[in-house]
Amino acid sequence: MLILTRRVGETLMIGDQVSVTVLGVKGNQVRIGVNAPKEVSVHREEIYQRIQHERAMHEHLQHLDQDYQVSYEDDNYAQKNFNR
């Protein structure tokens, strides 16, 4: 991890397109501003983790739904062809 010291009003660059500026310090809180292109997502860590969790759950549910569809189609096939 790179550790930097910045004062209020000072900026650091991440690559060529992302800048992070220290806007203020009050007690143990630091306000920062992030300038980034629209295609770059910027989230607080706890929000990012929630998004990742929701994506994983959505993918899992889609996978379960696909498994159910295959199973349901197999059951229909079996009923049509073997229950005569």
Curated annotation (Swiss-Prot):
Subcellular location: Cytoplasm
The protein's name: Translational regulator CsrA
One GO MF term attached to the UniProt entry: mRNA 5'-UTR binding
Chain's role: A key translational regulator that binds mRNA to regulate translation initiation and/or mRNA stability. Mediates global changes in gene expression, shifting from rapid growth to stress survival by linking envelope stress, the stringent response and the catabolite repression systems. Usually binds in the 5'-UTR; binding at or near the Shine-Dalgarno sequence prevents ribosome-binding, repressing translation, binding elsewhere in the 5'-UTR can activate translation and/or stabilize the mRNA. Its function is antagonized by small RNA(s).
Gene designation per UniProt: csrA
Protein family (similarity comment): Belongs to the CsrA/RsmA family.
Gene3D superfamilies with a match to the protein in the record: Translational regulator CsrA (2.60.40.4380)
Mitochondrion in keyword set: no
InterPro entries named in the record: CsrA, CsrA_sf
GO terms under biological process: mRNA catabolic process; negative regulation of translational initiation; positive regulation of translational initiation; regulation of carbohydrate metabolic process
Chief localisation class: cytoplasm
Keyword line: Activator, Cytoplasm, Repressor, RNA-binding, Translation regulation
Cellular compartments per GO CC: cytosol
Pfam families assigned: CsrA
Classification via SUPFAM superfamilies: CsrA-like
Subunit composition and interactions: Homodimer; the beta-strands of each monomer intercalate to form a hydrophobic core, while the alpha-helices form wings that extend away from the core.
